[in-house]
From Swiss-Prot:
Subunit field text: Homomultimer. Assembles in the nucleus, presumably in an immature form, then migrates to the cytoplasm once assembled as mature virion. Interacts with Rep; this interaction relocates Rep into the nucleus.
Similarity annotation: Belongs to the circoviridae capsid protein family.
Gene that encodes the chain: Cap
Name the UniProt record assigns to this protein: Probable capsid protein
A GO CC annotation given for this chain: T=1 icosahedral viral capsid
Region described as Nuclear localization signals: spans on this chain: 5-38
Function of the molecule: Self-assembles to form the virion icosahedral capsid with a T=1 symmetry. This very small capsid (17 - 22 nm in diameter) allows the virus to be very stable in the environment and resistant to some disinfectants, including detergents. Essential for the initial attachment to heparan sulfate moieties and chondroitin sulfate B of the host cell surface proteoglycans. After attachment, the virus is endocytosed and traffics to the nucleus. The capsid protein binds and transports the viral genome and Rep across the nuclear envelope.
Length: 250
């Protein structure tokens, strides 16, 4: 049997207490934990639905391509603008409250991630099967078509983030949106000329709750002899981060 040299116990060391053993003394009731972060952060998950209608009655012609973005649906009255913005993400299509205000008890926010799920809102057995494309564009310069100006080819065919999409089936895209920062000078462009790369984001003031975050484009080919409206439902899940709790009333 080997012999080991006895080691003296240090003056300040103690035996490790078993993890499953109860504490001998109660915790102090008046102990208040120190706030270690600069300001408290809250993560919120919100889901809203938008319906998009491709094509019209008798237009466009067969094999023409129509393209639109998530911001294609116009707002009705004073309700929030459908799309990727804080006001629509939190309140949906509800009208403003007292004093024509939308209130957030936080000073800052950022939209960390967005999940877009496309589903058919029509009977897939009664329509000719077709296909299209979805692509991610974070600067807002999304190619869209107007009535009578549809393309002969897919507008998003050359995009590196393009994925094939069939309106008869479920389709999902997940991306990190970027807020719109309009260019300076006398330009009339509304898309962003600068944004943080990768998964980084910027804190925005909650007062600017209608800033548009870009974005995703959708294209679809008209495959029937006579065009008819084709409605697609988009379920958008917003992952929002709020900072600096205030709790103040509007």
């Amino acid at each position: 049997m080997p012999l080991y040299r006895a080691r003296p116990r240090s003056l300040y060391s103690r035996r490790r207490r078993a993890t499953n053993r109860r504490r001998r003394y109660r915790r102090r009731r008046l102990h208040i934990g120190r706030i270690r972060s600069k300001y408290t952060i809250f993560n919120v998950k919100q889901t809203q639905n938008i319906s998009f209608t491709f094509f019209g009655t008798g237009s466009p012609d067969k094999n023409k391509w129509q393209a639109m973005s998530l911001e294609a649906v116009q707002s009705s009255g004073t309700s929030p603008k459908p799309g990727i913005n804080l006001r629509f993400a939190v309140f949906g299509d509800r009208l403003p409250g007292t004093g024509n205000q939308y209130h957030y008890p936080f000073d800052y926010y950022m939209i960390r991630m967005v999940k877009v799920e496309l589903r058919p809102a029509f009977n897939p057995f009664q329509r000719v099967r077709t296909q299209g494309s979805t692509y991610i564009d974070k600067e807002g310069n999304i190619t869209t078509t107007t009535s009578g100006g549809e393309w002969n080819v897919d507008p998003y065919a050359a995009m590196s983030s393009r994925k094939t999409w069939s309106p008869h089936r479920y389709h999902k895209r997940v991306f990190v949106p970027k807020p719109t920062i309009q260019q300076g000078g006398t330009g009339t462009n509304i898309w962003s000329t600068w944004y943080t790369p990768g998964g980084r984001q910027l804190w925005l003031n909650s007062i600017q709750d209608n800033v548009v975050f870009y974005g995703m484009g959708m294209s679809l080919r008209q495959a029937e002899d006579t065009a008819a409206p084709l409605t697609v439902e988009a379920t958008i899940t917003y992952y929002i981060r709020f900072g600096q709790w205030t709790g103040l009333s509007p």
